[in-house]
Design a protein with these regions (language model features):
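Feature detects amphipathic, helix-rich regulatory segments
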Residues: 1-194
Length: 194
């Protein structure tokens, strides 16, 4: 669904889209938010430990957290990318408001679809760039490098939306199947131990 090896279009594509994708700097399709504030009941804090790495899902109900922490405000219209140790693949596509505590980039889409940006930050190309980082013990992705890197982007926002929706549907199916698998494992263990 993303162009490979310098191609102008991906090998697999939705019907009705024929235009070449264009090369755009990341800073042209997403900008970093920087408004900081303390967390509260209405704006729960979100930390690295709250997100399942490589899955982009919360591992707890963060609205139940009581500690007050300062971080970057997000309102659900942005994508979160963990810049600390980018090889850990911490990312989140929130549909709620909160405060991103720690080393998160809060990425606001600029003339681009939020779900597409969320998928773009998971590509191998983005990962390769983000991991060209400074620091050996605590490497961090370099915004200057990432923001000035060009990525292939569909001209049509409708195509961006379809790509985002497609991968969101796949994630949903995977989660459902994982829940079923977990249920059957627990059931099996119960019967074996009985």
């Amino acid at each position: 669904m993303f162009p490979q090896n310098g191609a102008k279009v991906p090998e697999i594509r939705f019907n009705g889209f024929t235009h070449d994708w264009e090369q755009r700097k990341f800073s042209d399709i997403a900008s970093r938010e920087s408004i900081s504030r303390e967390s509260s009941y209405d704006l729960p804090s979100l930390e690295y430990e709250d997100v399942i790495a490589e899955e982009g899902r919360l591992n707890k109900d963060i609205s139940l957290k009581e500690n007050i922490k300062k971080g970057i405000v997000f309102d659900g219209s942005q994508v979160l990318y963990g810049k600390l140790r980018p090889y850990l693949h911490n990312w989140l596509n929130p549909d709620f408001s909160g405060v991103a505590v720690g080393d998160w980039w809060v990425l606001k889409p600029n003339n681009a679809d939020k779900s597409f940006i969320y998928r773009l930050i998971q590509t191998q190309r983005f990962d390769d760039i983000a991991n060209q980082s400074a620091g050996s013990k605590m490497p961090r992705a370099d915004w200057n490098l990432v923001s000035n890197t060009e990525f292939a982007v569909p001209v049509s926002q409708e195509e961006q939306e379809k790509i985002g929706e497609y991968f969101s549907s796949l994630d949903h199916l995977i989660t459902l199947h994982q829940r079923h698998t977990d249920f059957y494992k627990k059931t099996s263990c119960y019967f074996i131990s009985s």
